[in-house]
Amino acid sequence: MARSLKKGPFVDHHLVAKVEKAVAIKDKKPIKTWSRRSTILPDFIGLTIAVHNGKQHVPVYVTDQMVGHKLGEFALTRTFKGHPADKKAKK
């Protein structure tokens, strides 16, 4: 179910503060965050945000097409290594 429009998008306050600070001083270093649940706002465009995937921080460069999506969508938590090959098919 989608979030109500009257509530607005959810963004952690500490992330907004870090983004505003980075924009003010024009800092290009990645902003490290564990907040995968935060919605990407237009203020984030052009910044690199390092999103935690459970093991490490994955750098995500924010573009205008990402606005409205969650940060966690761009930092995958699972690695798919493929299904095991069928030994009978190889022979």
From Swiss-Prot:
The keyword rRNA-binding applies. Pfam families: Ribosomal_S19. GO terms for biological process: ribosomal small subunit assembly; translation. GO terms for cellular component: cytoplasm; small ribosomal subunit. Keywords: Ribonucleoprotein, Ribosomal protein, RNA-binding, rRNA-binding. PROSITE patterns: RIBOSOMAL_S19. GO terms for molecular function: rRNA binding; structural constituent of ribosome. HAMAP family: Ribosomal_uS19 (MF_00531). Protein S19 forms a complex with S13 that binds strongly to the 16S ribosomal RNA. Belongs to the universal ribosomal protein uS19 family. This is Small ribosomal subunit protein uS19. The gene is rpsS.
